[in-house]
Amino acid sequence: MSLELTSGAFATLVIGLAVVLPVATVVAWGRVRGGAVLRTGQRWLLVVAAQAAGILAVLVVINNQFGLYSGWDDLLGRTVQDSSAVVLTPQVRTGDPSSGSSGRPSSGGRAPTAAPVPWVNGLPAGFSAYDGNRTFLAMVAVPGSSSPMRLYVSLPPQYDQAAYAHKQFPVVELLHGYPGTPTTWFHAMDVRARLQAAMGAGATPFVLAVPQISVPGAPDLECTNLPQQPQVATFLTTEVHAILASHFRVRTDRAGWGLMGYSEGGYCAAALTLRHPELYAAGVDIAGYGQPLSAFFDRYPAQRAAGRLSVLLRGAPPVAIYASASAQDPQSSGALTALTHDVRPPTTVTTRLYAQGGHNTSDWSAQLPADFQWLSGHLGGVVG
């Protein structure tokens, strides 16, 4: 039986304790033995244990609902890395476009690339197998940080089929929320099954790139390069592109790359798409918001102002944005209004306001097939 933080067994155990301990407290209340002080102490222990079990059960349910922490290492802030693992440092051939300024597609609109890397024993060099579902994990060096970041890559079934042996696949880069973890996409969001369902209805077989957006030990940088801080935007854009291009059969033109994120990752997906039209053609913002909300940005008012989606839309980059929110989620639904108000051609913004739903992964997961269908209509398909 697995007692991982997000496992059903652990949730059942904790909820069971939350039910049993209050009952046990009532039953044992009049049966404790000893002097008055000892009896009082035992009763207090029973009450505290019952209360703690109830609080823990609530926290476990909230964590499983929102995908805040994927496991014990994530909860305790420990970086998951095999001591023998290779930390990839991409060698990018082109200049770094990820400083945060808006750009325009270069001629050909191609992403940064690196020299081809061979596969060894069925694995891309520098990657390890994640869970046996054609999903791989690498640790990647981040400029300005001594802590590497996780990058997961999940391949569609078509990738291994003979008919696609020499084809290049489009990529969707998935950004999680904060606090959160990349593996929330595989568990609470169940993204691989959702993509499979979308493909059954005609959606494109995307390669999924799932990077970590929060640098271990650093403040919440909201996918932005800030002075004297880890350059997380460079990692998410230039480095992720270079690693995918050198390790997998993927498209390197902007028409073959899109972004999707939820909550903070939704803001990041919209902001990075608007900032980097030379890299991305489309972005999906699920329950995001209109500007950096991290208190750390109080130190960087200019960067916070520049990071507002209303400001980024003024540059009118040639990209497409799809934003969705629930009417019962005031912060993200308010951001939809701002997006439609500030958009200018050739930028296009499509919005969807759901009448019901909360700020949680169960609602967002259900929306994913429609999100992949939208991306299929705004990104290029498999080529070669």
Question: What positions do the PLM features span?
Answer:
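Non-catalytic cap/lid and distal C-terminal segments of serine-dependent acyl enzymes
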Residues: 1-384
